[in-house]
Amino acid sequence: MFHSIEEALEDLRQGKAVIVVDDEDRENEGDFVCMAEAATPEMINFMVTHGRGLVCVPVTEEHATRLQLAPMVNANTDKQGTAFTVSIDEGSTNTGISAHERSQTVLAMLDEQKDADDFRRPGHIFPLIAKAGGVLRRAGHTEAAVDLARLAGGIPAGVICEIMNEDGSMARLPQLVEIARRFDLKLITIADLIAYRMRTESMVKKEIEVQLPTAYGDFRIAAYTNELDGKEHVALIKGEIGPDEPILVRVHSECLTGDIFGSYRCDCGPQLHAALEQIEANGRGILLYMRQEGRGIGLINKLRAYKLQEEGLDTVEANEKLGFAADLRDYGIGAQILRDLGVQRMRLLTNNPRKIRGLTGYGLAVEERVPLQTPEHLHNKQYLSTKQEKLGHLLHLNG
């Protein structure tokens, strides 16, 4: 159904448009997207005729600053936080609304000899400011357009137009598939663009690596910074890491209450210690400690979830009651750290099939799942049962 990002980039380089679909839980919409430098009158006319939405021009913050594109409103209350600027027309246009004149405005925006005084405000082209970091910071069509233009080798600016049906309703996936077929356009998802960038770019920086003697044995500890959000992650490394055989790996998400305070509500602490013991016994391996407290919802929200569990909800229901998915963790940054450490093939210490899928999706080979069984007891029995029944964890529970 969907095309690859590589196929879409090739079409964009040839001046074609593609259809980009966002997440079902977000806007659940498709937009026509092209590189801004491909915004011919024919392209604009195609978008307004067959898309029927608003023609917008996503640009970088630097681009918006150069043209003095101020925010459209002082207080942005849009549900998705779309960063509209004041609308513009190129100064020599007439009304600015025709396909020819909208094309003229878009192309003028790319001319570095033009400045703010060369445009009238308001107008008929609606610039949008993409977040620095692109779809890795905000999974919107704005960021997707700028990312795609950059990845295609062009100026990081695009043209987008929402796609509506003839009756004025929003086109959903079945209609978008038909539109892509009718006009021979590539159809891609923002989720696939995120995965592509995580596979092909590096967003992590190793800051330091030192020796770390522990109660389990002698390790090296390497600290990494996620350059997108500033979060710090660490890897405990045992032995030499190379491609000659699969490496024993544990990807462990931070759990202050379990790892540090020995909470009985979860099995995180016992899993952490068991993993270190197994890596030490194996003589070689990596424990990657990721700052993803509470399966990604953070410490305060995890404690709020505990409160809801005291009122009778299970761990999944509590997350959903707070407005979160059952598991918000993303394994892309972890995969980049493992790649930086030289890991290509691994034996993964986990009971979580989603973790296996998450890491293999970023180009790492999981050649074996090594179970990580820890004791169950009165306090964590329901928690473990919920992980097994609702999250698909591969556990062997008593009764």
UniProtKB/Swiss-Prot annotation:
Residues that, per the record, bind Mg(2+) 2: E27, H141
Region described as GTP cyclohydrolase II: spans on this chain: 200-399
Keyword flag Magnesium: yes
Residues noted as binding Mg(2+) 1 in the record, renumbered to the chain: E27
One MF annotation (Gene Ontology) recorded for this entry: magnesium ion binding
Pathway: Cofactor biosynthesis; riboflavin biosynthesis; 2-hydroxy-3-oxobutyl phosphate from D-ribulose 5-phosphate: step 1/1; Cofactor biosynthesis; riboflavin biosynthesis; 5-amino-6-(D-ribitylamino)uracil from GTP: step 1/4
Membership in a protein family: In the N-terminal section; belongs to the DHBP synthase family.
UniProt function note: Catalyzes the conversion of D-ribulose 5-phosphate to formate and 3,4-dihydroxy-2-butanone 4-phosphate.
Name the record gives this protein: Riboflavin biosynthesis protein RibBA
